[in-house]
């Protein structure tokens, strides 16, 4: 099977034109007409993931995060990005990323995370100008109200989150939940206007925890933790449309952030 046959399936779900202007989603290493036999799914391209790809005979690695965001000026293995790109080229492993286009796709990243947390009746938090139901973040409701701290403990258990950083508790109970995977501080205002009791996201800065002004609780669950669901989401997209192509979920896709708890 050629790469384009596989990426076309992903891009029907999450068209590349839905990515943000700063992004670099799409085929990064390889040619669309290259023949591939097995794909490995991960959050990031790392040397450990490439070790796994080589060991498992995977000649296509599909990740959520693009390994290259800016132009590379040299290939001398001076940093991890250069080493991984050079190694992928030498090993004939194609690299493909579906990033903010997957974030904004209907049924995409935030939708998947919200569903994992039992949030229903989902709608887009910040619709994109492209229309077609695309946009960033979602808001919805739990079947019934639950204590705020207990809900955060549920998040910890279901997502295997070690640490949650959160703002002042706004209300004792949570019913309406807003979710944005990855860095979502820019949508705090949208979550507040949507009447959310809690906003689940990542990469919050110090002052971001003051921004809600006790109108809602903001919970930072960690960037990797919020986006690990990308692996299963991409697996589901491909599995529904590819019956004869082997797709493997990485066992070595790991969080680069470590916690001392």
PLM feature segments, named:
Residues 1-261:
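Active-site catalytic microenvironments in core metabolic enzymes, especially phosphate/sugar-handling
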């Amino acid at each position: 099977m050629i790469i384009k046959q596989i990426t076309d399936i992903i891009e029907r779900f999450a068209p590349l034109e839905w990515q943000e202007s700063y992004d670099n989603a799409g085929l990064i290493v390889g040619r669309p007409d290259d023949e591939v036999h097995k794909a490995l799914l991960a959050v990031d391209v790392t040397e450990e993931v490439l070790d796994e790809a080589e060991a498992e005979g995977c000649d296509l690695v599909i990740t959520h995060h693009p390994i290259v965001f800016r132009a590379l000026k040299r290939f001398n293995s001076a940093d991890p990005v250069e080493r991984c790109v050079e190694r992928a080229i030498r090993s004939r492993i194609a690299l493909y990323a579906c990033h903010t286009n997957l974030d904004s796709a209907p049924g995409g990243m935030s939708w998947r995370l919200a569903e994992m947390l039992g949030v229903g009746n989902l709608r887009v938090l910040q619709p994109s100008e492209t229309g077609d139901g695309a946009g960033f973040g979602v808001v919805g409701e739990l079947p019934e109200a639950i204590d705020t701290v207990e809900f955060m403990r549920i998040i910890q258990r279901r997502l295997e989150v070690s640490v949650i950083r959160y703002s002042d508790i706004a209300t004792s109970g949570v019913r309406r939940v807003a979710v944005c995977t990855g860095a979502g501080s820019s949508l705090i205002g949208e979550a507040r206007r949507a009447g959310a009791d809690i906003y689940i996201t990542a990469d919050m800065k110090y002052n971001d925890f003051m921004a809600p002004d006790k109108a809602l609780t903001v919970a930072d669950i960690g960037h990797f933790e919020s986006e690990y669901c990308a692996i299963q989401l991409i697996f589901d997209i491909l599995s529904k449309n590819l019956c004869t192509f082997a797709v493997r979920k990485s066992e070595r896709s790991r969080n680069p952030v470590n916690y001392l708890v």
